[in-house]
Curated annotation (Swiss-Prot):
It is a peripheral membrane protein. InterPro entries: AAA+_ATPase, ABC_transporter-like_ATP-bd, P-loop_NTPase. CDD domains: ABC_Iron-Siderophores_B12_Hemin. The gene is hmuV. It comes from Bradyrhizobium diazoefficiens (strain JCM 10833 / BCRC 13528 / IAM 13628 / NBRC 14792 / USDA 110). ATP binds at G37, P38, N39, G40, A41, G42, K43, S44. This is Hemin import ATP-binding protein HmuV. Residues 5-242 form the ABC transporter domain. Part of the ABC transporter complex HmuTUV involved in hemin import. Responsible for energy coupling to the transport system. Belongs to the ABC transporter superfamily. Heme (hemin) importer (TC 3.A.1.14.5) family.
Amino acid sequence: MSAVIEARHLSKRAGRAKLLDGVGLTVAAGEMVAIIGPNGAGKSTLLRLLSGDLRPSQGEVWLKQRDIGSYTPRELAARRAMLSQHINVTFPFTVEEIVLMGAGDRSAREAGRLVDAALDEVGLAHFRERQLPTLSGGEQQRAHFARVLVQLACGEAEHGPGLLLLDEPTSSLDLRHQIDLVEAARRRAGTGTAVIAILHDLNLAIRFADRLVVLSGGKLAADGPRTEVVTRETIRDIFEIDAVVHQADGVPYVLPQSMRAAASAARI
């Protein structure tokens, strides 16, 4: 599959601080990549650079074989959609109005169809007339995810496989809706979208991503299939915890030693 997004030697400084240092990354159409790493590793900085919202101090980003800086805001919105970690919820729009913002200049009929489908997918169809600030944090997150799905669908209808960026999309969600959201992202990868998600739940990242990209101290520490990246040594070196890596149906999962000891004690 052809590359949808390619980052070359990306570095970003803020004053004297180096937030990102020489990171390279390529993600193909139909591939889902999870970015993992400790707090302050540069994950959100990398995602903002890949989105075009932030310009690198060094290096370049190519989106669909074109320098991302050469796109107009309208052109960029048609080729990549991003769910940010921090979302302004003070504006008094309804859920339906928020999701409709992703449809751009689509006809009322087409926009309505896309909005209905997205609200059904995130489980908010019954809240469509509710004011966004009256919802819980998790419900607001799902409403904005529905908007992003509509934006992505509109762009891909015109320009082919696009880029879906998710910055800690599950941070406000309960376990069920965490899984629902990541499964929805996984479905988009199945239809050709390139998906890049920052996920703090390591086992969720392992379960759904094709590749894991590990950042540490602003540098690329590892990039590869989950079976190669998820080792006891990597977990210890990057996250500074002692953990055991198990396998279930060929998929690794991580259990910190403290949890393992607690589980063993509970069985005694």
